[in-house]
Curated annotation (Swiss-Prot):
Belongs to the eukaryotic ribosomal protein eL40 family. The gene is rpl40e. This is Large ribosomal subunit protein eL40. GO terms for cellular component: ribonucleoprotein complex; ribosome. GO terms for biological process: translation. Keywords: Ribonucleoprotein, Ribosomal protein. PANTHER family: 50S RIBOSOMAL PROTEIN L40E, LARGE RIBOSOMAL SUBUNIT PROTEIN EL40.
Length: 48
């Protein structure tokens, strides 16, 4: 997908808050903006 594996890791290895859609660090347990605990991994497959 990305040209460099470092860039791909930086873009895809994040967690997404299911309430406010904020990007959070991979080690997060709750959202940095709204403190919601429902986080999911960012989808690695393209949706097209």
């Amino acid at each position: 997908m990305a040209r460099f594996s470092e860039a791909e890791n930086r873009v895809l290895n994040v967690k997404i808050c299911m309430r406010c859609n904020a990007r959070n660090p991979i080690r997060a347990t709750r959202c940095r903006k709204c403190r919601y605990k429902g986080l999911r991994m960012k989808s690695k497959e393209s949706r097209g």
